[in-house]
C-alpha cells in the first residue's frame, strides 16, 4: 500500500514538474519571440519589451503584463510595416478559459474572459501603409467561430496619426471602456458581413478628437455612453471647429471649401435595438433628442473652388450604407447663421434662423407600402424677427424624387433682410412691411415650382453700385424701379396678387440655396420683376 502511494505521489510530482516546466518554457518562449519578431519585422525601429508572462495550462489562462513599445528613430522605416512610430504601454493582456478546436476547415476559438488594458500609446502609421482589403485566398473558405464570455477593453490616452496621400489626419481617444457579454462571431465561407452577436454592450468615452487633413477642422466629442440593455446612447457636447479664419479657409483647405462651425449640446438616443442591429444590420431607434446647437457657415466666392455636385438632404439619407428607422427626432433651440461673400463683394451677405425647434416624424431610408415620405416640421425666427413655420415632406425611396415644402412667415420689417440682400444683390430696402407670406414648393432634384402669396405694403428700394470701395446709389434706376417696376403694395387697387414661379436647381450649390432660389422666384414675381 505504501509503495503504491509512493508511486502515485511520484507520478504526481513528475507531472507537476513537467507541467510547471512546460509553463516556464512557454512563458520564456512567448516573451522572447514577441520581442524578437517585432524587432525583426521593423528592422529594429520598433522595440518591444515584455515585462511578465504567466501561463496556466490547467486553468487555460494566459496573462501578459507591462509590455512597453518604443521607437529607435535613427533606424530607417522599412517598407510594408504598418507603423513608423510606436510608443506606449500595454498594462495587461489576459485570456482565461481558452479552448481551441479545428475540424476540417472549421476553426472554433472560445474564451471565458478577455481583457486588454492600454493606458497610453502614440502611433504614427507608415507613409506607404495602405488600407487594402486582403485578396481572396483559400482561407476565405474556412469557417471560424469566436466566442468570448466577458470582453473588456480599456484605452487610456491614445494618439494615432495616419498618413493620407501627402497629408495627415490624427485621432485622440481618452478613457475608452468597452465591455461585452457573450460576444460571438460566426463566419461562413466567403461571408462579407459575418454575424456578430452579444447579450449586452456597454461603452463609455471621456473624450475624442479628430484633426482633419490640412489641419482644416477639428472634431471634438466630450463624452459618449452606449448601453445595450438600457437601450440608450448619450453623446455629450460635439463641436466641429475650423482651424483657419473664415476669409482664408477656402484657400488653405481646398478639400473643405466652406468654413463651417458647429457646436451641439447633449444628444440622446432612446430605445435603440441592439440585437436587430447586430443580427440584421438595421438600426432601429425610438427617439432622438438634440438639445441646443449653433451652426455657422461661410462661403467665399472670391476664391475659385473646384465644383462638386452636392446631394440634397433626402438623397444623402437614401444613400446611407446602413438601413435605419427613427420614430421621432426632436430638435431643440437651434441657431443657424449663413454668410456668403460674392465674387465682387467686399462684405458677406448674412441670413440667420434663430431659436429653431423641429421634429422629424418616421425618419428612415427603408420604404414601406404605407409610407413613401417622412416629415420634418420646424418653427423659429428669421433674422430674429419674423416667426416662420415650415413642413417638409421628403421621399424615402431613391426611385421617388419628389418633395414638398409648405411654409409661412409672419409679420416683420422687410428692411431686416438688408444684411442678406444688400451685399449679394446690391439692393437696399428703404421701407416695407411684411404682413404675411405663404408658400408651397413642389419639386425634384432638377426643378421646383412655387405657389406664393406675399402680402406687404410701402415697399421702396435703392439700387446700389460699388465703386472704389464705396457703396453709391443708382439714382435714375432707383426712381425707375420704385415708380414703374416694383409693386409697392400687395394687395393693391387690383386686389391680392398670387403667383406661380419655377426655379432650376444648381447642382453645385446646397439644399439651402435650392430652397432660396425657389422662394426668390416667387418673391420676384410678387413684387413685379
Where are these regions (language model features)?
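Hydrophobic membrane-insertion alpha-helices, especially the h-region
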Residues: 6-21
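Extended terminal
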Residues: 2-9, 395, 401, 408, ...
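Outer-membrane beta-barrel proteins
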Residues: 123-126, 245, 297-299, 461-463
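Terminal hydrophobic membrane-targeting helix
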Residues: 18-123, 141-142, 148, 163-265, ...
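Glycine-rich, small/hydroxylated-residue low-complexity segments
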Residues: 109-114, 203, 280-301, 315-324, ...
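Elongated, acidic membrane-bridging lipid-handling scaffolds
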Residues: 95-98, 102, 107-231, 310-403
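Flexible, surface-exposed loop regions and adjacent strand-edge segments
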Residues: 128-134, 303-309, 424-425, 467-473
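Flexible, solvent-exposed coil segments and beta strand-coil junctions
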Residues: 72-76, 131-136, 202, 244-251, ...
